[in-house]
């Protein structure tokens, strides 16, 4: 039998969600079975899957010891790069400027060096990430951007901050702004574009429809033309909705794909010589007014932005970022 005392960071979440993160070596289906079979108790009593944990709760796990493999000593993240461009940090959150070319989470091609592992390494060195404590909160990202997109990513240092950030993003109380270079010239200097986005069944690609379709979700993208030449335009984008690949797929469907985009661009097989990555950067976020007291209410009406964008001249970026 193993006993766990719930701390502040792990409170205010469902017991099943906590156990799935904590018991990483046990399949979720087996965890649910253990709860149903009364092999997991809360404060000595039978619990429901939907039970929300409180600080000080005592979990009793009547599970075979061999299932508690020591996963806390996984130090693979320490092999990741130490390169981390921090825009802002406090005891609850980190705001990072992610360079293009780096994935945010491990995948089949990038199993070690990714943004979240760099953050874990940074916090571990600062003694803020306790890998020897299975109950300690593992740093988590509140938002994601594509591997070849650069810009702002927010990380939470504790579960309450993550919960607040997730709710703020869901309710569109954290606004995200991008700059991008696209092919051609837009029909209007500024506009709010509406369409519907869905997933391709056979490819990791998003499809756009300008009429409602089953399985498609509405997207809204606001743009302003900042500068244009005969062949290309610099756009400022505000995401009204935030779907995967929204900006890239939406602009491509409008006939103005982002330069350097090998998936949604004109040439899907070769990257533009001038643009080794897609010319898209999440350069600014703003927090709306916090209407209720919370752990992060000091961020109310705050604004954060990157210091530079790889595809723009530094002085020019300083000028247009104030617009």
Outline where the language-model segments fall.
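Pseudouridine synthases involved in rRNA/tRNA modification
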Residues: 1-33, 81-84, 205-207, 213-220, ...
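Ser/Thr-glycine-rich phosphate-binding loops at phosphate-binding pockets of nucleotides
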Residues: 149, 156-158, 241-249
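Short loop/turn positions at the edges of beta-strands in beta-sheet-rich folds
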Residues: 90, 149, 229, 239-241
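RNA pseudouridine synthases
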Residues: 1-201, 305, 312-315
């Amino acid at each position: 039998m193993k006993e766990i005392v719930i701390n502040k960071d792990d409170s205010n979440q469902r017991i099943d969600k906590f156990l799935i993160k904590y018991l990483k070596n046990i399949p979720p289906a087996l965890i649910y079975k253990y709860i149903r079979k009364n092999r997991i108790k809360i404060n000595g009593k039978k619990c429901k899957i939907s039970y929300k944990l409180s600080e000080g709760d005592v979990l009793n796990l009547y599970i075979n010891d061999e299932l508690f493999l020591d996963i806390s000593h996984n130090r693979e993240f320490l092999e990741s790069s130490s390169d981390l461009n921090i825009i802002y940090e406090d005891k609850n959150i980190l705001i990072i400027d992610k360079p293009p070319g780096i994935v945010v989470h491990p995948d089949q091609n990038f199993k070690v060096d990714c943004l979240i592992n760099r953050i874990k390494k940074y916090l571990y060195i600062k003694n803020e990430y306790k890998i020897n404590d299975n109950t300690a909160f593992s740093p988590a990202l509140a938002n994601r951007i594509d591997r070849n997109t650069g810009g702002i990513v927010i990380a939470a240092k504790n579960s309450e901050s993550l919960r607040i950030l997730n709710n703020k993003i869901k309710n569109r109380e954290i606004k995200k702004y991008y700059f991008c270079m696209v092919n051609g010239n837009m029909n209007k200097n500024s506009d709010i574009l509406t369409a519907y986005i869905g997933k391709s069944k056979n490819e990791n690609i998003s499809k756009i429809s300008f009429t409602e379709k089953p399985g498609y979700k509405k997207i809204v993208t606001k743009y302003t033309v900042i500068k244009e030449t005969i062949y290309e335009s610099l756009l400022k984008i505000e995401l009204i909705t935030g779907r995967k690949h929204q900006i890239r797929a939406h602009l491509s469907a409008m006939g103005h794909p982002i330069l350097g985009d090998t998936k949604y661009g004109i040439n899907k097989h070769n990257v533009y010589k001038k643009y080794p990555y897609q010319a898209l950067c999440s350069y600014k976020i703003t927090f709306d007014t916090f209407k209720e007291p919370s752990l992060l209410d000091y961020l109310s009406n705050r604004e954060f932005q990157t210091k530079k964008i790889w595809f723009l001249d530094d002085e020019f970026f300083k000028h247009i970022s104030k617009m």
